[in-house]
Amino acid sequence: ALLAQNPYGLDFGERVAFLGASHPIHSVTADRSEFIGRHGTTEYPQAVLGGLALSGRIEAGDDPCAVVASDIDIPAGGDVTLSWLLGDAATPAEASALVQTHRGKDFDQRLADNEKAWRGFLDTIQVETPD
């Protein structure tokens, strides 16, 4: 997974953002110009169109972004399910643990678990008011 932190952010400077996947990630970059390319656009990034491996460059400054790349083989007549994991954690260790936990779960199971967690949170307070 690709982890990022902005210590200069006033509200969330201590937090760690992450981008991971349910499948192996083969290369990453945090350099927007590498991904988009000199004459590319966000709709047609040169790294994707050229099938290029990303450099692994992760540095502060410039124009950052988060890009992870994977090579996926789809068999003729087949299908492949891919899940992208985008989140936030208190520490890098917690971010890595979240990615590991959710990487191994089936998407439908993750969705059901998420709905159950939100229901538990949202259903705790019920307010009734007179008309």
Predicted features and spans:
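Trp/Gly-enriched beta-strand surface patches
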Residues: 1-76
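Residue-identity detector for glutamine
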Residues: 5, 46, 100, 109, ...
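A generic structural micro-environment signature
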Residues: 9, 42, 80, 92, ...
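Short helix/loop capping segments that flank catalytic or ligand/cofactor-binding pockets
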Residues: 12-13, 27-29, 82-84, 91-96
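Terminal amphipathic helices with adjacent charged low-complexity linkers/tails
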Residues: 88-111
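An acidic-aromatic substrate-binding cleft motif
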Residues: 104-131
